[in-house]
Structure formats: C-alpha cells, structure tokens
C-alpha cells in the first residue's frame, strides 16, 4: 500500500512515517507540508491513501481535498487534526 503523508508539523509527519513503515505492506511514497504540495504529490505518486492534516498554512487540508477529489474522484483521503473544533469535523 502506497501512502503520502502531508502535515505542516515535521515531528508529526516523521512520527507517522515511522509508525506506518513498521508495517512491511506499507510504503510511505512521499511527505509534504501543505495543501499545495499535497496536490502535486498526489498527481505524481497516485497513492492508495493520502493522510493529511486539516489545518495547515496556505492551502489547508479541506481545500486540498476538494481540489484532489475534483480531479481524482476515486482518491482516498484521511484527514487528521489535533484540534477539537467541531466546525472542521462538520465540513
């Protein structure tokens, strides 16, 4: 399974990469730090799953998800957040 991780906190993305790569069936193909990079990386790698933070500087995870899904409706995107803001969950 090929995964891309996008998070503006390098500690979070590094920890996720370490945890996921402990499974031999998972390959972290790339990591990024904002929504614009997520869009580029998705097009380049066409991962099985895009694991992305919701809140990032510049283009956030929600906007990036909409853009990716507009071009790749079959995309599987998991959004992460450490915030408990219900407004983001509802979106």
Task: For the regions a language model picked out, list residue spans one by one.
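Conserved acidic segment of CheY-like receiver
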Residues: 1-12, 16, 20
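Conserved sequence signature across two-component system core domains
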Residues: 6-7, 32, 50
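Conserved active-site segment of CheY-like receiver
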Residues: 8, 80-84
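The feature encodes the CheY-like receiver
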Residues: 12-13, 57, 81
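Short hydrophobic/Thr-rich beta-strand motif most characteristic of the beta2 strand and flanking loop
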Residues: 25-33, 41
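Acidic catalytic/metal-coordinating carboxylates
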Residues: 34-37, 60-63
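Active-site beta3 strand of CheY-like receiver
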Residues: 45-51
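Alpha4 helix (beta4-alpha4-beta5 surface) of REC/receiver domains from two-component response regulators
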Residues: 63, 67, 84-91
């Amino acid at each position: 399974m090929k995964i891309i991780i996008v998070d503006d906190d390098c500690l979070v993305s590094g920890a996720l990469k370490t945890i996921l790569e402990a499974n031999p069936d998972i390959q972290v193909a790339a990591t990024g730090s904002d929504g614009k990079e997520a869009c580029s990386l998705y097009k380049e790698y066409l991962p099985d799953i895009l694991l992305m933070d919701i809140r990032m500087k510049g283009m956030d995870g929600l906007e990036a998800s909409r853009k990716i899904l507009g071009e790749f409706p079959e995309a599987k995107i998991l959004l992460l957040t450490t915030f408990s803001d219900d407004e983001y969950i509802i979106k």
